[in-house]
């Protein structure tokens, strides 16, 4: 696979720099950008993909809703980024049954491009209080867990994916594989 340019959108999450490092360690050209970067500035960078980081609260998600609706490149939302994708397309987010920072087991419902080769179960690291409660219309439900029903999803026609867990942290098994699957989507787009 060629070296891709992947922009990491900073939503003020504690793991944003880990996303950047994970992408860089997988030999991709990457940089972190503020979540208030104008769309025209993002497009001027000619990125192959965007990753929306996690963050502490939706009120600080900047222009993420605009990015997922208006930028026509592959997008991966992680944690709050996943929730922002859902909200941008009419889904609902609410407080989860269990919040906090813990290892959980994910059940892959549908492998799709992003979860290819990762199932049927994956041990991942989660750190969140809120979760996607209702999928946006037409979105495909990809994974679930005992504490969060919508752990992963994708847009029905666009290469837009969301995962509630953190593939960038070392405790997540197969996190690099998930990111590599995303890069393959970017490379084909």
UniProtKB/Swiss-Prot annotation:
Gene3D superfamilies, alphabetized: 3.40.50.880
GO molecular function: ATP binding; GMP synthase (glutamine-hydrolyzing) activity
Pfam families cross-referenced by the UniProt entry: GATase (PF00117)
E.C. numbers: 6.3.5.2
Residue intervals of the Glutamine amidotransferase type-1 domain: 5-189
Pathway assigned in UniProt: Purine metabolism; GMP biosynthesis; GMP from XMP (L-Gln route): step 1/1
Superkingdom, natural source: Archaea
Keyword tags: ATP-binding, Glutamine amidotransferase, GMP biosynthesis, Ligase, Nucleotide-binding, Purine biosynthesis
Record InterPro entries: Class_I_gatase-like, GATASE, GMP_synth_GATase, GMP_synthase_A
Reaction(s) catalysed by this chain's protein: XMP + L-glutamine + ATP + H2O = GMP + L-glutamate + AMP + diphosphate + 2 H(+)
Top-level class of the enzyme under EC nomenclature: ligase
Active-site residues (renumbered): 79 (nucleophile), 166, 168
Quaternary structure note: Heterodimer composed of a glutamine amidotransferase subunit (A) and a GMP-binding subunit (B).
Entries under PANTHER family matching the protein: GMP SYNTHASE [GLUTAMINE-HYDROLYZING] (PTHR11922:SF2), GMP SYNTHASE-RELATED (PTHR11922)
Its job: Catalyzes the synthesis of GMP from XMP.
NCBIfam families: guaA_Nterm, PRK00758.1
Name of protein: GMP synthase [glutamine-hydrolyzing] subunit A
Annotated source species: Methanosarcina acetivorans (strain ATCC 35395 / DSM 2834 / JCM 12185 / C2A)
Organism placement in taxonomy: Archaea, Methanobacteriati, Methanobacteriota, Stenosarchaea group, Methanomicrobia
Gene name of the record: guaAA
């Amino acid at each position: 696979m060629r070296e891709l340019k992947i922009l990491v959108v900073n939503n003020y999450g504690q793991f944003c720099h880990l996303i950047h490092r994970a992408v860089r360690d997988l030999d991709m050209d990457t940089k972190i950008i503020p979540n208030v970067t104008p769309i025209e500035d993002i497009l001027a960078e000619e990125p192959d993909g965007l990753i929306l980081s996690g963050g502490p609260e939706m009120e600080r998600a900047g222009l993420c809703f605009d990015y997922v609706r208006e930028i026509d490149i592959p997008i991966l939302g992680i944690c709050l980024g996943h929730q922002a994708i859902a909200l941008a397309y009419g889904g609902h987010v609410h407080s989860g049954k269990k919040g906090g920072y813990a290892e959980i087991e994910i059940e892959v419902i549908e492998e799709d491009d992003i979860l290819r080769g990762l199932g049927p179960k994956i041990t991942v690291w989660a750190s969140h209080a809120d979760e996607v409660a209702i999928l946006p219309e037409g979105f495909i439900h990809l994974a679930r867990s005992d504490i969060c029903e919508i752990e992963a999803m994708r847009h029905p026609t666009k290469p837009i994916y969301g995962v509630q867990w953190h593939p960038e942290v070392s405790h997540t098994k197969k996190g690099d594989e998930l990111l590599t699957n995303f890069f393959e989507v970017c490379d084909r787009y």
